[in-house]
C-alpha cells in the first residue's frame, strides 16, 4: 500500500457494498473474471480502506494475481496461496556481454548441476528436484529455521511429510526459473524465480482447508469459498501467521542459497574471468503477508503477484518464462 498515491493514476471501481478497488489499469484491459474476484474481496468486512490492483492484474486461484489486500483483524490463506513467499532474486556482476562465450552450454550445465530443479517420482524418494546429499552450507542455514519449524509441527503434525531441509537451495518446477540476462548497458545479471518449495505448498493447502472448514462450522457465507479466512483471536489465526512468516523466511533463504550456488558454479566453470557479483542484489517476495502500519493502524497486507513499493524499495518485474522478453529491476519513488 502507498498512502499518498495521486488519484489520477488509477481507476476507482466502486462495488455495491464494501470498500473501493483502486486499479492501476488505465489503458489496460481488465478481464471480467479478475474484476469479479476483486469485487468479491472488496465486500469482506475486514478489508482496510481499499483493495489495489496492479497493471498486470489477472484472474488467479484463490485471489486475483496482481492484487494488494489490506486486512484488519483477519487473514485469507488462499489469497497468499500455496507458493508462500514466492518471489525473485537478481544480482548484478561486473561482467559485460562481450565477455560471455558464444556458446553458453557449459555455463548452463554448471548451473543445472549446482541447483536441483524439476520434480520426479511425485516428489518422493529419488526426486531430482531435491538434494540427495545436502551441502554443508545448506545444513548450517537449515538449523536457523529448524526450531521455529519444529514448534509449528508440534501444533500441526500433519505438516510433517518430509522434503523440507533437502529442498532448501532448490528451484522447483512450474514457472520457476534461473537465467543469465543483460541490462541496457550490456552488464550481466543472474536472476531467479522461486519460493518456499514443498513445505510452503503443504502449509498453504493445509491452512486453506482448515479455513474453509471454519467457515462451514461458523455458518459464514462468502461470495467465494476461496475467501475463507481466520479472524484475529480465533484458534488458527496466530498459527497461520506464524507458519506463513516461517515459510516466507524459508523462501527468501532458498533464493539466497541458490544464488550463492549459481555464482559459485559459474565462477568454477572456467568459462569466464574472475568476476564480482552482488554489486546490486535484490531478493523480494511477490506472494506474501506482511505486518504493516498504515493510517495509524496496525494491519496485515497480503500481496499476490505484487511487491511493496515504498520510497527506495527495490523490486523485480519478470517477463514471461522461456520467451525473448524483458524483465525489469525497479526502484520505488
What does each model-identified segment do?
Residues 2-37, 46-51, 61-65, 69, ...:
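Domain-length cofactor-binding catalytic modules of enzymes
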Residues 73-94:
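N-terminal cap/recognition module
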Residues 58, 86, 196:
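Short, glycine/acidic-enriched loop or turn micro-motifs at the edges of active sites
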Residues 87-124, 129-133:
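Compact, glycine/acidic-enriched structural inserts
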Amino acid at each position: 500500500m502507498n498512502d499518498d498515491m495521486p488519484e489520477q493514476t488509477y481507476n476507482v471501481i466502486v462495488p455495491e457494498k464494501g470498500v473501493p478497488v483502486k486499479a492501476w489499469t488505465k489503458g489496460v484491459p481488465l478481464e471480467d473474471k479478475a474484476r469479479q474476484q476483486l469485487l468479491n474481496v472488496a465486500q469482506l468486512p475486514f478489508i482496510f480502506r481499499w483493495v489495489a490492483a496492479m497493471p498486470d492484474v489477472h484472474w488467479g486461484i484463490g485471489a486475483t494475481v496482481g492484487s494488494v489486500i489490506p486486512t484488519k483483524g483477519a487473514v485469507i490463506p488462499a489469497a497468499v496461496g500455496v507458493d508462500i513467499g514466492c518471489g525473485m532474486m537478481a544480482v548484478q556482476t561486473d561482467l559485460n556481454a562481450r565477455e560471455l562465450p558464444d556458446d553458453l552450454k557449459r555455463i548452463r550445465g554448471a548451473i543445472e548441476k549446482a541447483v536441483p530443479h524439476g520434480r520426479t517420482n511425485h516428489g518422493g524418494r529419488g526426486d531430482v528436484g531435491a538434494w540427495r546429499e545436502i551441502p554443508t552450507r545448506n545444513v548450517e542455514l537449515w538449523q536457523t529455521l529448524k526450531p521455529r519449524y519444529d514448534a509449528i509441527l508440534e501444533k500441526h503434525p500433519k505438516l510433517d511429510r518430509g522434503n523440507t531441509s533437502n529442498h532448501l537451495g532448490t528451484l522447483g518446477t512450474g514457472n520457476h526459473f534461473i537465467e543469465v540476462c543483460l541490462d541496457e548497458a550490456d552488464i550481466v545479471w543472474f536472476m531467479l524465480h522461486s519460493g518456499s518449495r514443498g513445505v510452503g505448498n503443504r502449509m498453504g493447502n493445509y491452512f486453506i482447508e482448515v479455513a474453509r472448514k471454519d467457515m462451514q462450522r461458523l455458518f459464514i457465507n462468502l461470495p467465494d469459498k476461496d475467501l475463507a479466512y481466520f479472524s484475529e483471536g480465533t484458534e488458527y489465526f496466530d498459527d497461520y501467521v506464524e507458519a506463513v512468516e516461517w515459510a516466507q523466511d524459508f523462501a527468501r533463504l532458498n533464493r539466497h542459497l541458490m544464488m550463492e550456488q549459481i555464482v559459485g558454479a559459474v565462477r568454477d566453470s572456467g568459462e569466464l574471468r574472475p568476476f564480482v557479483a552482488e554489486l546490486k542484489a535484490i531478493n523480494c517476495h511477490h506472494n506474501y503477508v506482511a505486518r504493516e502500519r498504515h493510517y495509524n493502524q496496525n494491519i496485515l497486507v497480503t500481496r499476490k503477484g505484487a511487491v511493496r513499493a515504498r520510497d527506495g524499495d527495490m523490486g523485480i518485474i519478470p517477463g514471461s518464462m522461456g520467451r525473448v522478453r524483458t524483465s525489469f529491476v525497479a526502484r520505488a519513488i
